[in-house]
Swiss-Prot record:
Other comment: Present with 172 molecules/cell in log phase SD medium.
Matching SUPFAM superfamilies: POZ domain
Gene Ontology annotations of biological process type: protein homooligomerization
Pfam families: BTB_2 (PF02214)
Species the sequence originates in: Saccharomyces cerevisiae (strain ATCC 204508 / S288c) (Baker's yeast)
Name of the protein: Uncharacterized protein YDR132C
Keyword Lipid biosynthesis: no
Entry keywords, A to Z: Cytoplasm, Nucleus
Amino acid sequence: MSNSPTVATLSQEYFDPNIPQILPHEKMYKIQVGKSLFKISGASLSSDGPSFFTEYFSKKRSPSNNDDSNNDTMESNKNEVLFIDRSAEVFEWIYQHLQGYIIEIKDEVQYTMLFADAMYYNLPRLRSLLKETDYYFTNIGGQSFKIAKNLFRREGDSPNYFEIYAATVYIDVEELIISKKLLRPPSHSAPYIPRSSEYFKDLLTLLGGASIDLDDNKRNALIKECRYYRLLNLEQRLIKSHISYNPITRKEEICLLLKDLSKKGITFPASSAFSTSPYFEDDFCSINECDSLSKTREQPANKKIKLDMTEKYNDSWNMLCYKRPFLDKHPRELIFQINSTDCTIILNKESQSIHVDITGESAYKFEALFGSHLPNTPSGAPKLKNYQYRFPSDSTQTKIETHYLLPACIYLCDLDINGIKISQVQTLLTDKNKFNDRVIDVSDPLDLRFCSGLKLYLRKSLWKLAVKDGNIMLIAIKAIAFNGTKEYYKGYEYL
């Protein structure tokens, strides 16, 4: 039971002049909520009105049509008590609000109950305060959280799960009460999210600007949490990346995992505004050309053939660039990493060509990223489906797998095969004794067959993607490869 001090003797000037004159400010009213009796002034009731209370007591003040009974009615009104069958505990908070105090909300249960009764009593100012509060209140994994809204000030972190929830659930309840003219608000449970409370604490730490030590497993777990809560800026900040400046091409480069790329960040510079290193030219990526290059480099230094070669290959490719959503102001040349054996380099002995075979999850991700995001060229936009093939799975022979067989350049690649560093890639390409594998020949897309060649299965690899004249080429930057079953099992680790 709560009793406020008598304020009938206080003057009109004592009250806030912004309080509307709905009820007499100096008059005291009695309201019993549950088992508790509250005495409250007209000024306090008028401070948040019009409301259920101001309408009720205003009607009681209206004079009766029977003048003889006016005095009796006014006398009875002095002793009248408004009975309300609601929670006295919740009304205690509302009582403090009407008296001008700030309500310190502790958790999601208090917030939900307070919001429901603010609707029930039709308190417009309290409803507005609750909707515009500086915090979100929720329960995650059994632990209550009071989340400051300014943690989501960065672009991409809003709108998020909490903002959308607050903008829909509570507003829907409000509209339901108003439209259906319900006597009381429908029962509504406090928000509960069945996620890890420990991971969410880490997210709050990062949102607040602090840093924490993360291994790969925890980093991936937090990225999943960011996607669940729609914290897109924080997700990008958690994704592993490396930015560097290439002094040869005089361009910035960014390295990311293929699985972490977003279609929104993919861009290509205009052909006229970009000229790459001559070593990215496709002729350098055939077996014959590597052989001729090897011979060329054996020529005396005073020969002019190097200058001629530079002029011959001083053409431009459109290199794939990437701009991280919500973080980067300008795009950088992209190097993407594939961390699985979904990627295989195929060297064809007959056609003297090099392709990279991408399959499995990497193929699906590759298609999702580049299926409709390749730029137009004078020869038309490259079509990824032109490089798509479907073969039976090697394991079951019944499941059909999608393969992307794309022209590749490995001349610049820092290549490690079977644990041995290959210092000169052209020596590998010109050693015909190594070409004993059975590989797919895609020289004629309408007549696929197998031929002799060399397969390099990649454990990890770094790539650039280039486009020119409607064609696509993948440029290997760094790769760890194996060739053969024994070498594959060397990569096994004990449990």
